[in-house]
Design a protein with these regions (language model features):
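Long, contiguous binding/interaction regions
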Residues: 2-152
Length: 152
């Protein structure tokens, strides 16, 4: 779901606590400014069966302006992955080639590691992670999903 809110201190905490107080898990949460000053957009991914109840509770919050349940058929979603992979002289070329073929950007390469950045759907990031797993993932982090509707 996408939530348009006033960009005020404590809004994120109130939204997150409203969801967690009801016993719902937040699978992904991303917040950022919009093209309208003083407004932020939250993209929250939670269990499907809880969306209607969550929307009702969030609509009661003062700083919430609009809530949209995103239709997967009419939504573009994206997230970013940073992943640090173990490499050596024998594997460096292979790892970098696989990353390039996957559309990842090489951010840093050291003697025994390489860091890549990939932007894409959750499925694409998971596929890339599985591709590099045999080489040894040292560290990785993913942002929360962001999404925008393609049709109004």
């Amino acid at each position: 779901m996408s939530i348009l809110v006033e960009d005020k201190p404590g809004v994120l905490a109130r939204v997150a606590s409203t969801i967690s107080r009801r016993g719902f898990n937040i699978n992904s949460l991303a917040v950022g400014p919009t093209n309208v000053e003083g407004r932020s957009k939250m993209t929250i991914v939670t269990e499907l069966e809880s969306v209607e109840q969550v929307k009702k509770q969030l609509n009661k919050l003062v700083n919430v302006i609009k809530i949209v349940e995103l239709d997967p058929e009419n939504t573009i979603e994206s997230e970013v992955l940073l992943i640090k992979v173990s490499i050596n002289k024998e594997t460096q070329t292979s790892v970098i080639e696989k990353a390039n073929l996957s559309g990842a950007k090489s951010v840093d390469v050291g003697q025994d590691y390489a860091v890549f950045e990939l932007t894409g759907t959750s499925k694409e990031l998971i596929k890339f992670e599985k591709l590099l797993k045999p080489y040894g993932i040292i560290e990785m982090i993913r942002t929360g999903r962001i999404a925008i509707q393609t049709k109004l």
